[in-house]
A protein has these predicted regions:
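Peptidoglycan cell-wall recognition and remodeling modules
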Residues: 45-136
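Intrinsically disordered, low-complexity
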Residues: 1-68, 126, 133-136
C-alpha cells in the first residue's frame, strides 16, 4: 500500500475516533479510484461474530444459552454484516439492524444492541422470543 493511501486511512481512522463539530476542509489528491465497501467480507463477519460472543460472555456475563440467542438475532438481522442496510426500506442499519444507527464500527453496533436488549428485554433469549413474532 502506498504511503498516501496509508496516510489517508490513518486520517480517516483518527477522524472517526475524534469527531469535531466544526467544518474542516480537507483536500485529497487521489490518483487511483476509491473503492467504497458496501458489504462485509466473510472474514469481517467471522470477526464480528467472535467479538459479539466475547462481549456477551465477558462484558455482560451471558451464558452459552443467551449467547446462542444473540447469534440467532444477529444472524437473522444481518448475518453479522456491520454494513448491512435494511431491505424493507427503513433506516435500520448494521449488525442488529437498529434504527438510527450511524456507526459503521462493529464494536459500537454490538454494544449498542446489547444495551438495548438488556434494557428492553432483560436477556437475549427474551428478545429472541419477541423477535420471532416480528420486531425486537
Amino acid at each position: 500500500m502506498k504511503r498516501q493511501t496509508l496516510a489517508l486511512i490513518g486520517l480517516l481512522i483518527v477522524a472517526s475516533l475524534f469527531p469535531i463539530s466544526e467544518k474542516v476542509e480537507v483536500k485529497v489528491s487521489v490518483k487511483h479510484p476509491v473503492v467504497v465497501q458496501t458489504k462485509a467480507t466473510m472474514e469481517q463477519k467471522r470477526a464480528n461474530k467472535k467479538m459479539a460472543d466475547t462481549f456477551a460472555r465477558v462484558g455482560f456475563g451471558w451464558d452459552k444459552r443467551q449467547r446462542a440467542c444473540v447469534h440467532l438475532i444477529f444472524t437473522k438481522e444481518s448475518r453479522y454484516d456491520h454494513l448491512a442496510k435494511n431491505q424493507q426500506g427503513s433506516s435500520a442499519y448494521g449488525i442488529a439492524q437498529m434504527l438510527g444507527e450511524k456507526s459503521t464500527d462493529p464494536a459500537t453496533q454490538i454494544l449498542r444492541a446489547f444495551h438495548y436488549i438488556e434494557q428492553r428485554y432483560g436477556t437475549p433469549c427474551a428478545a429472541w422470543r419477541h423477535h420471532r413474532k416480528g420486531w425486537y
